[in-house]
């Protein structure tokens, strides 16, 4: 008996049929790391170095968990001055004023004398957050005002303290200026600084001191 095997051949594809390949669509989800509020994420690159970002995260973690901030001093001291200033400004941007003051104390120890603009920025942030007692404490910690201080920075600090309406702190700033020789031949009174200070003292109920400031400024005028 003859056995015939029949093989089933697959139907051939004619040239008239076209194969269509379905490629799955890729979707991209934008993920942004940072605080879940409108303050924006930490800025990395030219503004904040990796070391600065890590320091900020460490400070905020210590603040959140109640760990003593003194434990963060050693890592902070390893940062260069520009990184410390960047950390301070970023903390102020996020309204972590207590942490910013902590960083300022490190700057004051490691890189004296400090730019008075940093003090002014912290005073403005404390005013914004209504932490007025902290302003008095901050100004009270200033040991002296260097004669090399920039007049614009000094004026900015005075404006900030006057804006917070801290009379005693304004008087202290003036006292420190006077003790450092402001208004003398060694440190000539800048006209704009004198005007800002005089108006501020007058506004805060210190007319005698305001007149004193105006007199110091006018004496040295040619």
Swiss-Prot record:
A single GO cellular-component term on record: chloroplast
Q: Which domain of life is it from?
A: Eukaryota
* Annotated S-S bridges: none
Which keywords, in A-to-Z order, does the entry hold? Answer: Chloroplast, Membrane, mRNA processing, mRNA splicing, Plastid, Repeat, RNA-binding, Thylakoid, Transit peptide
Protein name from the UniProt record? Protein THYLAKOID ASSEMBLY 8, chloroplastic
Q: How does it sit in the membrane?
A: Peripheral membrane protein
Residue interval of the organelle targeting sequence: 1-32
Q: Where in the cell is it found?
A: Plastid, Chloroplast thylakoid membrane
Principal location listed in the UniProt entry: plastid
Single Gene Ontology MF annotation:
sequence-specific mRNA binding
The keyword Thylakoid belongs to this UniProt entry's keyword annotation: yes
- InterPro entries reported for this sequence: THA8-like, TPR-like_helical_dom_sf
User: How does gene deletion manifest?
Assistant: Pigment defective embryo arrested at cotyledon stage in homozygous plants, partially rescued when grown on sucrose-containing medium. Retarded growth and greening. Reduced abundance of both the excised intron and the spliced product from ycf3-2 and trnA.
Report whether Metal-binding shows up as a keyword of the record: no
**Known role:** Essential protein required during embryogenesis. Mediates group II organellar RNA introns splicing (e.g. ycf3-2 and trnA). Binds weakly to specific RNA. Promotes the biogenesis of chloroplast thylakoid membranes.
- Which biological processes are named by the entry's GO terms? chloroplast organization; embryo development ending in seed dormancy; Group II intron splicing; mRNA processing
- Which stretches are PPR repeats? 115-149, 150-184
Q: Which family does it belong to?
A: Belongs to the PPR family. P subfamily.
């Amino acid at each position: 008996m003859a056995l015939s095997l029949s093989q089933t051949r697959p139907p051939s594809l004619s040239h008239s049929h076209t194969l269509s390949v379905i490629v799955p669509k890729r979707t991209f989800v934008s993920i942004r790391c940072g605080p879940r509020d409108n303050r924006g994420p930490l800025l990395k690159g030219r503004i904040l170095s990796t070391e600065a970002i890590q320091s900020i995260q460490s400070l905020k973690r210590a603040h959140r968990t109640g760990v003593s901030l003194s434990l963060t001093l050693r890592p902070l001291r390893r940062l260069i001055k520009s990184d410390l200033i960047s950390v301070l400004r970023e903390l102020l941007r996020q309204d972590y004023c207590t942490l910013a003051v902590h960083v300022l104390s490190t700057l004051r120890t490691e890189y004296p004398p400090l730019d008075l603009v940093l003090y002014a920025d912290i005073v403005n942030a404390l005013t914004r957050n209504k932490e007025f007692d902290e302003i008095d404490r901050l100004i009270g910690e200033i040991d002296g005002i260097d004669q090399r201080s920039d007049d614009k920075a000094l004026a900015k600090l005075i404006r900030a303290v006057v804006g917070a309406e801290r009379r005693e702190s304004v008087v202290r700033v003036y006292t420190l200026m006077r003790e450092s020789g402001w208004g003398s031949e060694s440190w000539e009174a800048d006209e704009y600084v004198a005007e800002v200070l005089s108006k501020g003292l007058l506004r805060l109920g210190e007319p005698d001191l305001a007149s004193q400031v105006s007199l110091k400024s006018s004496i040295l005028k040619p």
